[in-house]
């Protein structure tokens, strides 16, 4: 019997041989999308885990640095301010002792910080004052509440990297920008028992707000604006207002060259220059 052959169009043959090919390809594409999403989620969870590990290590470091000569109240206060500060344990300990010294010595004047971020150091001041039964001191918070001002070429970190370069390469969410809106700072202050009317927030560049809006007499002055120009301006206008026996803290002395140069230039003009006590990489001065 003779063989019979049929000519079938290629498209029809494909449909005959693989009737479900299109559906299978669609399912494979969906599986690939799902797999990509899964990989993304795994990466996110891995990053979250790394963040948790980093926070745990930070907490462990904080706890191991809680000095044996600190009492339980000191430890509790420092733990409470942790969410509001980037300040090290040594600096917070020094600040605690400075506030206590001012109270015990009866040093007259208000408390003032330039560059507050979320207000953690002010929280600590208020808590130490309140626990000592002192609620009549005004506490001034000077900040742009919009992040750091523009650094200059003199502002270089301890690794030799310019602050401007670091900021340009960093997201504005990075800590070097130190952005904390006024509303966020005010909300933090409202968690404290210290009289709210005693907190005086001054918004703007310190070059614009000081000396005009600064208190006349200062018992404790904490400078944390990082850069040469701001630190120089603060010292030149505020040192004369610090009460004899009062305390000045320069937070970024060891972190940024500009802050250190401004501090050294100013104090070396005094006769005699004061002793700068080290607290972490900050410097603490008691005015004679």
Which residues are covered by each model-predicted region?
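Conserved alpha-helix/loop element of class I SAM-dependent methyltransferases that forms part
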Residues: 94-106
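Boundary detector for helix-to-coil junctions that initiate low-complexity/charged tails
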Residues: 1-74, 86
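S-adenosylmethionine/decaboxylated-SAM
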Residues: 68-89, 105-288
